[in-house]
């Protein structure tokens, strides 16, 4: 199975991971994801190219990168325009108030904050500009800002931003995905490329929502729900009457537990893609890096307890099975109450069915962060997306080195 974390533009890393798995003919029977991981998972599971879903996933990411608007190349109708849009982003920039804005002196700021050389400064500046490009102009293949002029006639709250509950509309993603996903596959008996599991959260109850292609029809609405992250100002989605959903990353950015719950019988070999590293080698050097590391910890993999409990349950089941076989083989069953024996057999089969899966292997494939930056998950620039795909491929090859087997 393949587990894909959320992480905005960092999701391109997972594209490279799957490319490497495909090149080695490693098949996955379950693909689970949340946020952009859910988008990736849906493309792979429902890909119109059944033989090479990795090709369409890469095309998707390249299409997003081609729609990137370079902030430095835009001519504003008014010199004050960047300041106006910047004001709209105050809820975000106030939360991370140590970061520069597009109208502040970037170089001076980072010269004070870091003394690690020009290369790092150049990369950080590029990440910052890429973030503001996405924040100001959106990406017309994935999401659009609510303040753009074309929405003035259709949005009844356009001129009353104090009533806004979101700042970005990701409905453009629906049209983009139509080129890549055959939704007829994403339903029971739909013959998907893999079973698809997406996660979200019920806004009104805080309860987890799990969308499973083996049990229901997965639609674009479910993909929008799993990628509706409110702290990045995306809109909520009504997935069914009265059920309003946000991004599953609010509960867990690594939907392993959900997969173990819905697929409890078959043994598991797991490929877990980490967009946000659990472990780093050094402490943060300044406030931006403090915020970045805190963000990484919030979104990082927290499934160790789930893995441990799964292994404990496996040990218990083996012990129960030994006792059960001992009873069946050595006891005079004519002396046992038939009803009691039936109850024991029923419970044994139930426990084995509900929690019989064993985790055989977990391959952690983790993205590197040579220059930590809060804005890295909003960098959709072509160079960054292509580099992320290459890195995912390379890191997967390293993770599999000497461990490739038939799966």
Where would I find each of the regions flagged by the language model?
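Patatin-like phospholipase
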Residues: 1-34, 43-407
């Amino acid at each position: 199975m393949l587990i894909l974390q959320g992480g905005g533009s960092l999701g391109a890393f997972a594209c490279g991971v799957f490319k490497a798995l495909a090149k080695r003919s490693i098949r996955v029977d379950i693909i689970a994801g949340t946020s952009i991981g859910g988008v990736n998972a849906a493309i792979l599971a429902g890909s119109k190219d059944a033989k090479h879903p990795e090709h369409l996933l890469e095309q998707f990411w390249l299409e997003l990168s081609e729609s990137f608007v370079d902030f430095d190349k835009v001519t504003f109708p008014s010199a004050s325009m960047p300041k106006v849009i910047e004001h709209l982003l105050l809820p975000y920039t106030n939360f991370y108030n140590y970061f520069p804005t597009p109208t502040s002196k970037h170089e001076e700021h980072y010269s004070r904050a870091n003394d690690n050389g020009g290369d790092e400064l150049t990369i950080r500046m590029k990440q910052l500009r890429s973030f503001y490009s996405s924040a100001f102009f959106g990406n017309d293949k994935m999401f659009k800002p609510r303040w753009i002029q074309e929405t003035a006639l259709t949005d009844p709250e356009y001129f009353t931003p104090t009533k806004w509950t979101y700042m970005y509309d990701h409905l453009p993603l629906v049209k983009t995905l139509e080129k890549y996903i055959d939704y007829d596959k994403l339903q029971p008996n739909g013959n998907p490329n893999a079973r698809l599991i997406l996660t979200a959260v019920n806004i009104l109850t805080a309860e987890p929502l799990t969308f499973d292609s083996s049990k229901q029809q997965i639609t674009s609405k479910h993909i929008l729900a799993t990628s509706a992250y409110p702290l990045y100002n995306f809109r909520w989605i009504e997935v069914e009457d009265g059920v309003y959903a946000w991004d599953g990353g609010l509960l867990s950015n690594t939907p392993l537990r959900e997969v173990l719950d819905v697929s409890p019988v078959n043994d598991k070999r797991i490929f877990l893609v980490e967009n946000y590293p659990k472990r780093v080698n050094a402490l943060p050097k300044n406030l931006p890096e403090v915020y970045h590391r805190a963000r990484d910890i919030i979104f990082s993999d927290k499934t160790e307890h789930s893995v441990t409990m799964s292994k404990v349950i496996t040990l218990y089941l083996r012990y129960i099975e030994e006792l059960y076989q001992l009873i069946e083989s050595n006891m005079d069953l004519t002396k046992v109450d038939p009803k009691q024996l039936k109850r024991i057999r029923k419970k044994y089969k139930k426990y084995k069915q509900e929690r019989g899966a064993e985790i055989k292997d977990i391959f952690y494939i983790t993205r590197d962060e040579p220059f930590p930056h809060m804005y890295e998950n909003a960098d959709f620039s072509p160079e960054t997306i292509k580099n992320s795909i290459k890195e995912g491929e390379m890191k997967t090859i390293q993770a599999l080195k000497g461990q490739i087997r038939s799966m």
